[in-house]
Curated annotation (Swiss-Prot):
InterPro entries listed in its UniProt record: Mtu_PIN, PIN-like_dom_sf, PIN_dom, VapC_family
Family that this chain belongs to: Belongs to the PINc/VapC protein family.
Superkingdom to which the source organism belongs: Bacteria
Compartments where located: Secreted
Residues covered by the PINc domain: 3-142
Gene Ontology CC terms: extracellular region
Keyword presence, Magnesium: yes
Protein name per its UniProtKB record: Ribonuclease VapC41
MF terms in GO: magnesium ion binding; RNA nuclease activity
Organism annotation: Mycobacterium tuberculosis (strain ATCC 25618 / H37Rv)
Gene name of the record: vapC41
Length: 146
C-alpha cells in the first residue's frame, strides 16, 4: 500500500510543477487497483493548496474555486488505483507524538510527523519528494527525484 505526500498530489495536479514528470512516471508504474492512498490530511492539504492564489500563481494559474478543487480531487478518485484511506491506523497518535516531539518549536514538523506515523502504523510506503522524511526511522520511504 502506498501513501502519497501532498507534494506528490500537487505535482500530479499541476503539469508545470517541477516534480510533475517524475510523479507521473511513477504513477504510470502502478497497475493494481486501490493501492495508492490519500489520507484525510493529504486530502485537505491538496484542496487548500489548489485554492491558494500564491501557490497556483507560481504556475501561472489562478486558484481553483472550492468546487473546482473538489472536482480535481474527485478526478484522482476516478482512477481505480487511488482511494481515500479509511480510519486512522491503530497506534497512530502515539507514534505521531513520538515523531513530533522536539526540544524547540518546530511548526513544520507536525504534518511530516503525522504522515510518517500514518505510514508506519498503517503499513504504507510513503511516496514523496521531501528528503526531510528520512529523519523518521522505521518508515518505508520512496523518494521521487526531479
Amino acid at each position: 500500500m502506498l501513501l502519497c505526500d501532498t507534494n506528490i498530489w500537487l505535482a500530479l495536479a499541476l503539469s508545470g510543477h517541477v516534480h510533475h514528470r517524475a510523479s507521473r512516471a511513477w504513477l504510470d508504474t502502478i497497475n493494481a487497483p486501490g493501492v495508492i492512498h490519500f489520507c484525510r490530511a493529504t486530502q485537505q492539504s491538496l484542496l487548500r493548496l489548489l485554492t491558494n492564489r500564491t501557490v497556483l500563481g507560481a504556475y501561472g494559474s489562478p486558484p481553483l474555486t472550492n468546487r473546482e478543487a473538489w472536482a480535481a480531487y474527485a478526478a484522482f478518485l476516478d482512477d481505480d488505483r487511488i482511494v481515500l484511506a479509511g480510519a486512522e491506523p491503530d497506534g497512530l497518535e502515539a507514534q505521531w507524538r513520538a515523531f513530533a516531539v522536539r526540544q524547540s518549536p518546530a511548526p513544520k514538523v507536525w504534518m511530516d510527523a503525522y504522515l510518517a506515523a500514518f505510514a508506519l502504523t498503517g503499513g504504507f510506503e510513503l511516496v514523496t519528494t521531501d528528503t526531510a522524511f528520512t529523519q523518521y526511522g522505521g518508515i518505508e520511504l520512496r523518494l521521487l527525484a526531479k
